[in-house]
Amino acid sequence: NGVTSIAMESTGTYWQNLFSTLVGQGFDVILVNGRQTKNIKGKKTDIKDCQWIQKLHSLGLLSASFLPDSDTDTVRTYSRHRQNLLKQSASCTRRMQKYLRLMNMRLEVVVRDIVGLTGSCIIEAFLNGEHKGEELAKLRHYNCRKSEEEIAKALQFNGRKDYLFALKQEWDSYKHLKQQIMDTDLQIDRLLKEFIEKDEHKK
């Protein structure tokens, strides 16, 4: 009935599909923060909320939230996904450190990063059956501050196979997440190159 402009709240991710559909149909859609549309009076219902938003919009009292263009929004989606993968990877690392400690494998005491050069080599060899601290210490990278002797003393496996099993699963998950991060980085890089080629002004 002659409607050309629509205002809607940005609630979580629920608005995105509806917003895209309305814009695709030619409507001028204003996305507003819920703080602007808060109605203190009376009991809240969806219908009353809609009527209140319509009234504020018709009086010109709502300001639109910033919305990135489609290219920026696409990169932002990938970037957020990458951040989630990094958080999962960090959680995996913390759990691996816990299981190593429970097996009397105090790797975090002798290396700065248990998934760094020395740490990764030691974990991989340990999971492949090498449980002697002296042999694992030989995998020390040349720039590691601790000596082979110090590393060997810190790695004295107590034989707990249950923790060994858990460590193996966390290590597999960690490697999978690292690959996903690399794949996401490649995707972001590819998209950025496409956007730059599309817009001569961005070169």
Feature locations, PLM:
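A detector of single, family-specific signature residues
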Residues: 1-203
